[in-house]
From Swiss-Prot:
The gene is rps2e. The lineage of its organism: Archaea, Methanobacteriati, Thermoplasmatota, Thermoplasmata, Thermoplasmatales. One of its GO terms (molecular function) is structural constituent of ribosome. This is Small ribosomal subunit protein eS24. Keywords: Ribonucleoprotein, Ribosomal protein. InterPro entries: Nucleotide-bd_a/b_plait_sf (IPR012677), Ribosomal_eS24 (IPR001976), Ribosomal_eS24_CS (IPR018098), Ribosomal_uL23/eL15/eS24_sf (IPR012678). GO terms for biological process: translation. Belongs to the eukaryotic ribosomal protein eS24 family.
Length: 98
C-alpha cells in the first residue's frame, strides 16, 4: 500500500492533527479501517490508539481511497471530542447492549 499525504493540519485547540490522504493499494479487496489505522500510525510515528479514521471514500474503478484521519495528542482528548459512534468504529469504546 502506498500512502500519499495531501494535506496535514495542526489543530492545537482540539489537541489533534488532521490529515487528508490518498491510499493506493494493489489487492483485490479494500483495506480495512484497522489496516489503514495501523499504516497511518506507523507513518506518523504514533500509537494506533490515537488515530481516528473518520472518512474513507473508495474511488470507483481505481484501487485508491481518499480519506480523512485525526491523530489526537492523547486518549482523553479523543474521548472528549469524538462522537460515540466514531469511538466505537475505531475501537476506543465498546457498544452498549440494549
Amino acid at each position: 500500500m502506498d500512502l500519499i499525504i495531501k494535506e496535514k493540519r495542526d489543530n492545537p485547540i482540539l489537541k489533534r492533527k488532521e490529515i487528508k490522504y490518498v491510499l493506493k493499494f494493489d489487492s483485490s479487496r479494500t483495506p480495512s479501517r484497522e489496516e489503514i489505522k495501523e499504516l497511518i500510525a506507523k507513518h506518523e510515528g504514533v500509537d494506533k490508539e490515537l488515530v481516528i479514521v473518520d472518512n474513507n471514500k473508495q474511488l470507483t474503478g481505481k484501487h485508491e481511497i481518499e480519506g480523512y484521519t485525526k491523530i489526537y495528542a492523547d486518549k482523553p482528548s479523543a474521548m472528549l471530542y469524538e462522537p460515540d459512534y466514531e469511538l466505537i468504529r475505531n475501537g476506543l469504546k465498546q457498544k452498549e447492549a440494549k
